[in-house]
Amino acid sequence: MPGSTDALEPRRPYEVFEHTADVGLHAFGRTLSELFIHAAQGMESLMVAPEQVRVQVSREITVTGHDEVSLLIAWLNELIVLFDTEYLLLRQFEIDEISGTYLKGRASGEPYDAQRHDIGSAIKAVTWHEAAVELTDEGYKVRIIFDI
């Protein structure tokens, strides 16, 4: 499988940072697939602690973009739409196919349950402000800011 969440590198897969009335994330991955998975994990962790979410349902996601940044923003915004429309909290992410302009993958989790889930930040959207995907000696790195 092109991307999985089984073996994480020693470095944390993502780091949260504060940004004037919003919140940001640096995510890291050895591959583009791993970067997108870690960015999704980081974003979802802002909404709910991952250990509170069971893997009960899965949704296939296909998005396109004109480059890696727009593709990542489309991927993350599609995950936000799943919460906004189906109240799905997500925990597990898989990338089946990815290029610089196309992604096909899956996101799995469960519907929000007020009895079990403590919601943190409500994310409205991923912003374009300062969004950048960078290839480094260690792999990929992204900086993204969320409108909360």
List PLM regions with ranges.
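N-terminal intrinsically disordered, cationic/polar leader segments
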Residues: 2-148
